[in-house]
Regions:
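Aromatic/acidic polysaccharide-binding cleft in carbohydrate-active enzymes
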Residues: 1-66, 71-81
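Composition- and surface-driven signal marking solvent-exposed, interaction-prone regions
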Residues: 4, 32, 74, 97, ...
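A general structural signal for short secondary-structure junctions and capping/turn motifs
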Residues: 6-11, 93-95, 119-120, 146-149
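Active-site proximal loops enriched in glycine and acidic residues that flank catalytic Cys/His/Asp
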Residues: 18-21, 77, 105-108, 117-119, ...
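Flexible loop/turn segments at secondary-structure boundaries
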Residues: 24-29, 111-113, 135-138
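Carbohydrate-binding surface patches
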Residues: 81-123, 152
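Solvent-exposed beta-hairpin/edge-strand motifs
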Residues: 119-136
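C-terminal beta-strand-rich structural cap/linker in extracellular carbohydrate-active enzymes
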Residues: 140-162
Length: 162
């Protein structure tokens, strides 16, 4: 779902992105953020268990940090790839509100990647990571020059804007 959000915001220039169904009952719903399991369907108050999915956490890499009023800013990769190639490798987008810059990086590759984010006014950024075993986990402040991206991950990097 992170790739869909990225492409909607960067290629289609969507100004907002919404998820219509948060809680779903049953296994036949393929796009569940919060699936409800074990319920007889009569009452959410007395039975059933709500769990989270990776779709929820990858959506959170955007929704917790890219806030209303932010605007997308230009990201210039040092290499040239088509939109199709980017959708199957690395996707990067950045947003600002004048106080901070939020960058979301999707590593869709099967291998770990090391990238450099060039920022004139900051050397480090706060990194939040979603992987197969991490759910929007705060990874501390990381150097922007050698940012480690695990395979099949979504990272959000927050830098104070000066």
């Amino acid at each position: 779902v992170a790739r869909i959000i990225h492409n909607d915001l960067t290629l289609a220039n969507a100004s907002a992105w919404q998820w219509w169904t948060a809680v779903s009952l049953g296994e036949d719903v393929p796009i569940q953020l919060l699936p409800l399991e074990g319920s007889n369907g009569l009452s959410l108050q007395y039975d059933g268990e709500i769990s989270t999915t990776k779709m929820l956490w990858t959506t959170a890499n955007y929704s917790f940090f890219v806030r209303p009023g932010m605007r997308r800013i230009s990201v210039k990769p040092t290499y040239k790839v088509s939109d199709l190639e980017a959708a199957t490798s690395l996707m990067i987008s950045s947003y600002t509100d004048g106080k901070e810059v939020v960058t979301v990086v999707i590593n869709y590759l099967e291998d770990n990647q090391v990238i450099t984010l060039n920022c004139d006014y900051a050397q480090k950024g706060k990194v939040y990571l979603t992987t197969i075993d991490k759910n929007l986990q705060y990874m501390g402040e990381q150097p922007l020059k050698k940012l480690q991206l695990p395979a099949r991950s979504v990272a959000t990097i927050v830098v104070e804007d000066n």
